[in-house]
């Protein structure tokens, strides 16, 4: 059973799953807001942040210094990443069999139709335009987290690591 939060209008679910969340965001202010929104939403599980696309790829592909980092169940990805674009991060994750199951919520400052098409063509799970209003931004992040954290069934890290089929292994530090 769920109720609705009076402050945000987002459903309050009593059955939020423990999930690992990775936030890829180059703007420190947006990182802070995203983390605050996830905490407000009742994040259970781990939360990791990286500040740019190359670092995100090292993290998700478990390269040093992230060789022992947990595989996330959900990724919030900013499109405007320096050096390695958010679209490239999305492409790499969604083309790696052991990682393609991870839902990726892509955020951008505009709704450019070409960007939106590119995100979905690369199998992004959700595209949201970052709203200008703080309360709206927090509501979007909370809503996404509640959806992925309580409504849907996610592939778990344990299932991925247990006995993956040939070619489905999560890359290790020497990959």
Spans of features found by a protein language model:
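Short amphipathic alpha-helix used as the core "switch/output" element in two-component signaling
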Residues: 87-100
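Short, Asp-centered acidic motifs that coordinate Mg2+ and/or phosphate
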Residues: 74
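Alpha4 helix (beta4-alpha4-beta5 surface) of REC/receiver domains from two-component response regulators
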Residues: 35-36, 88, 110-128, 132, ...
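Negatively charged, flexible loop motifs adjacent to catalytic sites
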Residues: 27-30, 82, 98, 110-114
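Acidic catalytic/metal-coordinating carboxylates
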Residues: 52, 85-88
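Residue-level signal for the "D+5" position in two-component response regulator receiver
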Residues: 49, 81-84
């Amino acid at each position: 059973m769920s109720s609705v939060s009076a402050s945000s209008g987002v459903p309050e679910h009593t059955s939020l799953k423990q999930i690992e969340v990775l936030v890829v965001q180059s703007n420190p202010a947006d990182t802070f807001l995203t983390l605050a929104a996830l905490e407000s939403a009742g994040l259970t599980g781990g939360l990791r942040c990286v500040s740019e696309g190359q670092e995100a790829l090292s993290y998700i592909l478990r390269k040093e210094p992230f060789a022992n980092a947990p595989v996330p169940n959900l990724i919030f990805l900013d499109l405007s990443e320096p050096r390695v674009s958010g679209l490239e991060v999305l492409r790499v994750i969604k083309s790696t069999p052991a990682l393609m199951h991870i839902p990726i919520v892509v955020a951008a400052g505009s709704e450019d139709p070409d960007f939106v098409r590119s995100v979905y063509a690369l199998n992004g799970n959700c595209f949201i335009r970052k709203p200008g209003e703080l309360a709206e931004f927090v509501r979007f992040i909370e809503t996404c987290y509640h959806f992925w954290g309580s409504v849907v069934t996610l592939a778990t890290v344990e299932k991925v690591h247990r006995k993956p089929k040939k070619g489905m292994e999560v890359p290790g530090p020497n990959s």
